A protein has these predicted regions:
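Helix-rich C-terminal or lid/interface subdomains of diverse kinases
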Residues: 189, 221-224, 229-300
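Phosphate/pyrophosphate-binding loops and the adjoining catalytic core of nucleotide-dependent enzymes
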Residues: 1-7, 25, 82
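Soluble or luminal CAZymes and related metallo-dependent hydrolases
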Residues: 5-12, 35, 73-77, 120-123, ...
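ATP-binding pocket architecture of kinase catalytic cores
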Residues: 30-147
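Short, surface-exposed acidic
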Residues: 21-29, 170-174, 250-260
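A generic structural signal for beta-strand entry/edge sites
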Residues: 103-106, 209, 269
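An alpha-helical support segment within catalytic cores of ATP-dependent transferases
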Residues: 8-24, 133-196, 288
């Protein structure tokens, strides 16, 4: 019985998949990765190529960055956005199986051949631009909670800044939610599908070229400046990225303006909370808290 309160394992996931895939009883699996939200295993079974399974450890995600996110909805979103990627030429793994609505959500996917070589210059920028040029899908992303980008980003920024203050003891003047919402107005216009977590663990590559975008949990439908500001805070927005993205003067001006500042604060606060609370790392936490302080000084 798959209740909201139980913890799930790879064996649970395989049991569900047996209804759609032929999986031998002696199938072996090894944990590939796991994060705050999901577990990922490699499965080897007689008579078929190895494949990947991804599933939530528990239904409700509650932490200092996110409150009451439904991992079942996130899994369905992942399936839909992988399908959208395939339809529009964005590399992504092929979905092998996904249970019917109402069942425990486990995603079975092909294994994409990948290596650890660094990306070619501008590759991440080019792939990000390809994504941002697409007409967005008709989907309400879980991260947006059915609200406008400016509304949800403003609220989450203020909430996360309060957590940063509580956990670090570092205070100071914090912009109000209404002030941030006004500054963030541009992210409600000319919206596109944003991945919102384009770091090394969330894309696969081979010979320096991206072969698959994965993990769409943070996806939003908003103006690309929100994602560009996130990439600045991730340390991914290099000259090579900008060249590959072919950033325009207008986009650069928006990114360096008040909308970009508010977007950067949104991500900086999130990262500070991650390293203060969700994945504690005192050294990184100190760096991220200092970055939050630096950004706050730029608000009038």
């Amino acid at each position: 019985v798959y209740t909201d309160s139980r913890q799930w394992t790879a064996l649970d996931a395989l049991d569900i998949l047996r209804e759609q895939l032929t999986i031998s009883n002696d199938a072996a699996f090894e944990r590939v990765s796991g994060g705050i939200e999901f577990e990922v295993f490699r499965v080897s079974a007689r008579g078929r190529d190895p494949f990947i399974i991804k599933f939530p450890g528990t239904r409700w995600i509650i932490n200092d960055n996110d409150r009451d996110l439904d991992s079942f909805q996130l899994m369905d979103q992942e399936r839909r956005l992988i399908g959208f990627s395939h339809e529009h030429g964005i590399p992504a793994p092929r979905v092998l199986a996904y249970p019917e609505a109402g069942s425990f959500p486990v995603l079975a996917m092909e294994i994409i051949d990948a290596d650890d070589l660094p990306l070619l210059a501008g590759e991440l920028g080019r792939m990000t631009r390809r994504l941002h040029l697409l007409r967005p899908p008709e989907i309400s992303t879980v991260a947006q909670r059915g609200r406008s980008p400016s509304d949800v980003v403003a609220q989450l920024t203020v909430e996360r800044l309060k957590v940063v203050e509580q956990l670090s003891g570092v205070g100071g003047a914090v912009p109000t939610e209404s002030t941030l919402r006004e500054m963030l107005g541009p992210i409600d216009a000319d919206v596109r599908l944003l991945h919102m977590d384009l770091r090394r663990g969330n894309y696969l590559s081979r010979d320096g070229q991206i072969t698959g975008l994965i993990d769409w949990s943070n996806a939003m439908i908003a103006n690309p400046v929100l994602e560009l500001a996130r990439l600045v805070e991730y340390g991914e927005f290099s000259n090579g990225f900008a060249a590959g993205y072919e950033i325009t003067q207008r986009e650069a001006a928006t990114l360096s303006g008040e909308a970009g500042l508010a977007c950067s604060l949104y991500t900086a606060a999130m990262l500070a909370v991650v390293f203060l609370s969700e994945a504690p790392d005192p050294e990184l936490a100190a760096i991220k808290v200092e970055r939050v302080k630096e950004l706050l000084t730029q608000f009038g």
